[in-house]
UniProtKB/Swiss-Prot annotation:
It comes from African swine fever virus (isolate Tick/Malawi/Lil 20-1/1983). Residues 125-127, 169-173 are annotated as: Important for host CHOP inhibition. Transmembrane segments: none annotated. Belongs to the asfivirus DP71L family. Interacts (via C-terminus) with host PPP1CB. This is Protein DP71L. The keyword Acyltransferase does not apply.
């Protein structure tokens, strides 16, 4: 069976579940619920959330979804919001009076911060005085170096020693090579 025939026989995927409004309070059941969409299309924005919520139930592992990929078919419409038609302030602000409570908090805040004295400083940076500073013992070079650094220092020292002794010994060894009978 050719790939083209397989594609043409494949059923068209159903659009995913739409978000339904959650259960409302018993006192608000008589109010109509409106569904407001930001965009007119039903394109969702989060495929992982759609999978978790069960929006991709009709997808199987063997389907080639990339061949007929369509955002409208694979994603949930996550850009819809449900709103109540009327606002019932009795249930919304249960026991909280906006004007008086907010006014009380603001007056307490202003009273507290008006009593706090803030000292303005001309200089932005301050350094500690000498008696507060901690004295640090200087470490020896050997204490700070690891074994690889000590090996490198030894190698340089031996190279210097060889170069210094070569100057002295080369003259003596050169004379021995020139007159081997003389020194025996």
């Amino acid at each position: 069976m050719s790939r083209r025939n397989k594609r043409s026989r494949r059923r068209r995927k159903k659009p995913l579940n739409t978000i339904q409004p959650g259960p409302s309070k018993p006192s608000a059941q008589d109010e109509p619920i409106k569904s407001v969409s930001h965009h007119s299309s039903k394109i969702g924005t989060n495929p992982m959330l759609a999978f978790i919520l069960g929006g991709n139930e009709d997808l199987s592992d063997d389907s080639d979804w990339d061949e007929d990929f369509s955002l409208e078919n694979t994603l949930m419409p996550l850009n819809e919001v449900s709103l109540k038609g009327k606002h019932d302030s009795k249930h919304f602000n249960k026991g909280f009076d906006n004007n008086t409570a907010l006014h009380e908090v603001n007056t307490k805040w202003e009273a507290f911060y008006s009593s706090v004295k803030i000292r303005q400083r001309d200089v932005k940076v301050y350094f500690a005085t000498d008696d507060i500073l901690i004295k640090v013992r200087e470490a020896d070079d050997i204490d700070r170096k690891g074994p690889w650094e000590q090996a490198a220092v030894d190698r340089l020292r031996f190279q210097r020693r060889i170069a210094d002794t070569e100057k002295i010994l080369s003259a003596v060894l050169l004379r021995k090579k020139l007159n081997p009978m003389e020194h025996e």
